[in-house]
Amino acid sequence: MLFQSCGLLSALGRIGSRSPVTRGILARAAVVWARDVDGNWGAPTVSRLVTGHLHKCVRPPWTVPLAGRLYCTLPAAPSSHYRLIYTCKVCATRSSKTISKVAYHKGVVIVRCPGCENHHIIADNLGWFSDLEGRRNIEEILAAKGEQVQRLVGDDAVEILLRNAGESATQDGDKTGEAESAGNKLLS
């Protein structure tokens, strides 16, 4: 018996079957489709129970072409960091850094380019740099120049927070870990 709910396929029956199983892309799925000795696809078997909030599922291979297979995951907890990917205009080096959301929205973020070793201001919510003319982050700085920033959801990044900003962020449940404590040490 198959029950379909929000794209998630679950199966009842044949639990604990010893038939050969082809897992393919279903390494963490609760439901796997079994092939018999002749290579024909059989009914689904439940290989193991998936605990936690992450799961993957697909429809049986014969119902949907490979390009249109259904994948689903439950929503994960929101990340407390951004992944910044940028190209330095001085040396044209492309690099990526991990920065905390709290520092980006409430503090100062400065990253160092691995190519030319220059420091680049990514966010200044504390008003430390007067030449930014009131702009607070890289999105506003580049928007003033007519350029766009693509948001995609660390390394060699300096993140500075006010004590109030870090404390309110942890009260809101947005924990930044070492970046927050490093930022608080810099302000001491």
Swiss-Prot record:
Lineage of the source organism? Eukaryota, Metazoa, Chordata, Craniata, Vertebrata
State where the transit peptide lies: 1-68
Ribonucleoprotein among keywords: no
Q: Which organism is it from?
A: Xenopus laevis (African clawed frog)
Q: Where are the zinc fingers (DNL-type)?
A: 77-174
Any single GO BP term: protein stabilization
Task: Enumerate the InterPro entries for this protein.
Answer: Mt_import_TIM15 (IPR024158), Znf_DNL-typ (IPR007853)
* GO CC, alphabetical: mitochondrion
- Main location (coarse class): mitochondrion
| MF terms in GO | protein-folding chaperone binding; zinc ion binding
Record's protein name: DNL-type zinc finger protein
- Residues bound to Zn(2+) are 88, 91, 113, 116
Give the location in the cell: Mitochondrion
Q: Which Pfam families match?
A: zf-DNL
Keywords from the named record? Chaperone, Metal-binding, Mitochondrion, Transit peptide, Zinc, Zinc-finger
